[in-house]
């Protein structure tokens, strides 16, 4: 009987809301650090194990996800929705640029266990590009062992294109391997509440409660940047497309898609909601049936913001100088990373080390930044998903309405 009760409890924990569990871990970590500093430092091992698990799974995750995505891509899909795809990519890049501006206007700092003396910063854009080129030609095994994400990305893209010409059995095997790695990532993520409990406890016990203000500032910068993109940048892109007041459409998408996505924290889970909204807006079914699932995969403005802001927070913390060309290159890298962040809980956080590599930041420190992301992830991930998913409908509607108006004008002229 006791065994059955224990099994039932574990099942409820495994199937329970991860957001609520992380909140509980966060609160318990704060309480433990306040009540007993030695105990809080002792449970820091839980946080160390969690970060170690993330470090172990992240390189193979990037390799398999990107390789499977390219290998299983359907030929000709892009041509049907070219204007929407362009808006997706432009919106993601614009979000990354906005995040760079926000990060320099309101610089955030993190509490990391390494000092600036451990970092050899690049002297400028030329050295950054040189480092990127050297990283690209790394041995694949060496890239995986040393978490060289640039090298991993190059090999994943190359193998993905090569496997496009393979038979279906091979593609299915790659897809199954990708699903298996994704399952392992989800398993690690399920331990996030325990890891956050250990990280928060040990961090507060070591650095004091002033650390909380640093996280609050970082969260304000992240959410503020997402609001800027949702209420200023995206409406400008929509206005450029439809040439009329974009805000009725913007608010409709935020209200009927963003709110659902905020609580589900999954662009994939929000696809049926977005499909229903597209039907309500009388959009072309052949278009949105392709663009909405595609948007859930590559339209990741929120992820681009998260990657950029957290990377620059680490850069500011370590005192690494950043010039304008390097910041622009970071926007491009963050946009590319964001497009590969779909389908994984915390996917944008796990791609932060790739952006950190640009500035010579070691993987150990980059994973501490990822851990900070998980601490603030209760709100960050919800806001990120709300922005991502609502933008899928917004850009689809903008492109469809612009095309309808073009056809109507052509009909009038003829």
Swiss-Prot record:
UniProt topology in membrane: Multi-pass membrane protein
Transmembrane segments: 16-36, 46-66, 84-104, 143-163, 180-200, 219-239, 300-320, 332-352
PANTHER family: PROTON/GLUTAMATE-ASPARTATE SYMPORTER, SERINE_THREONINE TRANSPORTER SSTT
Cellular component GO terms held in the UniProt record: plasma membrane
Gene Ontology molecular functions: neutral L-amino acid:sodium symporter activity
UniProt keyword Lyase, yes or no: no
Any Pfam family hit: SDF
Disulfide bonds: none
Subcellular compartments: Cell inner membrane
Domain of life: Bacteria
Function: Involved in the import of serine and threonine into the cell, with the concomitant import of sodium (symport system).
Catalysed reaction equations from the record: L-serine(in) + Na(+)(in) = L-serine(out) + Na(+)(out); L-threonine(in) + Na(+)(in) = L-threonine(out) + Na(+)(out)
Keyword Transmembrane appears in the UniProt entry: yes
Protein name as annotated: Serine/threonine transporter SstT
Family, similarity comment: Belongs to the dicarboxylate/amino acid:cation symporter (DAACS) (TC 2.A.23) family.
Keywords in alphabetical order: Amino-acid transport, Cell inner membrane, Cell membrane, Membrane, Symport, Transmembrane, Transmembrane helix, Transport
Biological process terms in GO annotation: serine transport; threonine transport
């Amino acid at each position: 009987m006791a065994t059955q009760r224990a099994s039932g409890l574990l099942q409820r924990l495994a199937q329970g809301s991860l957001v609520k569990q992380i909140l509980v871990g966060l609160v318990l970590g704060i309480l433990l650090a306040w009540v007993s500093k030695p105990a809080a430092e002792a449970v820091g091992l839980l946080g160390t194990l969690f970060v170690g698990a993330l470090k172990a799974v992240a390189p193979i995750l990037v390799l398999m996800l990107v390789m499977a995505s390219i290998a299983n891509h359907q030929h000709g899909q892009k041509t049907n929705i070219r204007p929407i795809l362009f808006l997706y990519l432009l919106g993601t890049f614009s979000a990354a640029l906005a995040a760079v501006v926000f990060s320099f206007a309101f610089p955030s700092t993190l509490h990391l266990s390494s000092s600036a003396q451990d970092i050899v910063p690049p002297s400028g854009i030329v050295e950054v590009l040189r480092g990127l080129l050297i990283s690209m030609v790394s041995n694949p095994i060496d890239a995986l062992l040393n978490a060289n994400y640039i090298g991993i990305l190059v090999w994943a893209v190359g193998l993905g294109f090569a496997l496009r010409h393979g038979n279906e059995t091979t593609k299915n095997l790659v897809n199954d391997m990708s699903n298996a790695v994704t399952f392992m990532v989800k398993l690690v993520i399920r331990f996030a509440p325990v890891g956050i409990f250990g990280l928060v406890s040990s961090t507060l016990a070591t650095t004091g409660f002033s650390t909380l203000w640093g996280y609050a500032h970082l969260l304000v910068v992240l959410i503020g940047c997402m609001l800027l993109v949702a209420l200023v940048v995206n409406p400008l892109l929509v206005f450029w497309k439809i040439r009329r007041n974009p805000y009725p459409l913007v608010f409709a998408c935020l209200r009927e898609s963003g709110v659902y996505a905020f609580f589900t924290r999954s662009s994939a889970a929000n696809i049926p909601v977005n499909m229903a909204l597209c039907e309500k807006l009388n959009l072309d079914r052949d278009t949105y049936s392709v663009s909405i699932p595609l948007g859930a995969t590559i339209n990741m403005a929120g992820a681009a913001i998260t990657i950029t802001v957290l990377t620059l927070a680490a850069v500011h913390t370590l005192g690494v100088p950043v010039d304008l060309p390097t910041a622009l290159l970071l926007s491009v890298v963050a946009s590319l990373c964001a497009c590969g962040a779909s389908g994984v809980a915390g996917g944008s956080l796990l791609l932060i080390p790739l952006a950190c590599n640009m500035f010579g930041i070691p993987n150990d420190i980059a994973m501490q930044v990822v851990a900070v992301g998980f601490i603030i992830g209760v709100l960050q991930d919800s806001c990120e998903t709300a922005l991502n998913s609502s933008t899928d409908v917004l850009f689809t509607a903008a492109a469809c309405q612009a095309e309808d108006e073009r056809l109507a004008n052509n009909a009038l002229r003829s």
